[in-house]
Amino acid sequence: MDDAAVLKRRGYLLGINLGEGSYAKVKSAYSERLKFNVAIKIIDRKKAPADFLEKFLPREIEILAMLNHCSIIKTYEIFETSHGKVYIVMELAVQGDLLELIKTRGALHEDEARKKFHQLSLAIKYCHDLDVVHRDLKCDNLLLDKDFNIKLSDFSFSKRCLRDDSGRMALSKTFCGSPAYAAPEVLQGIPYQPKVYDIWSLGVILYIMVCGSMPYDDSNIKKMLRIQKEHRVNFPRSKHLTGECKDLIYHMLQPDVNRRLHIDEILSHCWMQPKARGSPSVAINKEGESSRGTEPLWTPEPGSDKKSATKLEPEGEAQPQAQPETKPEGTAMQMSRQSEILGFPSKPSTMETEEGPPQQPPETRAQ
């Protein structure tokens, strides 16, 4: 029985193809029960590799079934046939993904970026509070609903964090995600704290939101890793970013895992607080008292002529992305997209930039 017949018996009218790989595909469909369109990921067990079937797929199914958050793509139903096909019925994001938006419109204004990044951060806090880690956070996994709200998707690399007898989080060893979003400890192949890894990826995402470019050029991983470990972050002067925004990014892109921000510290950072038009940035502490953010303002070094990293804005001719993605092929929707998405220039573009760190001690965390 083909997919259309199987799904029709379950009340779904199959629509167009959204993505396809060697053993998985994603299609749109109309749900007769829900009375609206959905996305259905179809996985063929007969074609999938053993590692995916034994490790990644069971984790994804378990985690999707437990998640329920307004900024995470909703899973409506998961079922399997006797012919070895797994069907995952999900919310359909009608406005595409964040990277498509940035590719079309360019960098986001800080106010718009703040709203979207706050939605994403709340989704990550929800996951981390459940001891669930994503491990593949990137702009093309951030889908957009009809109102352009963030919907976190693709939990193919997600897992439940294990704890030892003393309650300490077990380290992960699997290289997950895309090199451009990967933390230095992951790129080095050493055991890593998965929640802390997610934070680094959040830093890359916020940089892309407000700069319209990648913070690091991943065409040379060895060179990129050296720059990351030196804690160098360049910001385009042309974007006129606020000090608070640059400071938050700088602290998320902290190579020292013991000093990188936690998700609660991100949410309490002064840049994340609602800004009254024309008034200075104010952070609200847990007691409800307003105070200046404890993060020092990011101050650019004068005369910097550093080059920017990979440019994402639709201003120049795109160049091919050389670095392949490491995601299992079972995630068909995102599988073939990385070369397209990073088909923006993957060599550094010449533009005036500012380079961190802040001139004041940078490691003070927001309280």
From Swiss-Prot:
Residue spans of biased composition, Basic and acidic residues class:
303-314
The biological processes this protein is annotated with in GO are: protein phosphorylation; spermatid development
State the active site. Answer: D136
EC number assigned by the record: 2.7.11.1
Activity regulation field? Kinase activity is specifically inhibited by 2 classes of compounds: biphenyl compounds (1,1'-(biphenyl-4,4'-diyl)bis(2,2-dihydroxyethanone)) and 1,2,7-trialky-1H-imidazo[4,5-g]quinoxalin-6-one. Activated by phosphorylation on Thr-174 and potentially by autophosphorylation.
| MF terms (GO), sorted A to Z | ATP binding; magnesium ion binding; protein serine kinase activity; protein serine/threonine kinase activity; protein-containing complex binding
> Which cofactor(s) does the record list?
Mg(2+)
Q: Name one GO cellular component term.
A: motile cilium
Positions binding ATP in this chain are L18, G19, E20, G21, S22, Y23, A24, K25, V26, K41
* Post-translational modification summary for this protein: Autophosphorylated. Ubiquitinated; HSP90 activity negatively regulates ubiquitination and degradation.
* Source taxon at top rank: Eukaryota
Matches recorded under CDD domains: STKc_TSSK1_2-like
Function summary: Testis-specific serine/threonine-protein kinase required during spermatid development. Phosphorylates 'Ser-288' of TSKS. Involved in the late stages of spermatogenesis, during the reconstruction of the cytoplasm. During spermatogenesis, required for the transformation of a ring-shaped structure around the base of the flagellum originating from the chromatoid body.
Know the name of this protein? Testis-specific serine/threonine-protein kinase 1
Name of the gene this protein is made from: TSSK1B
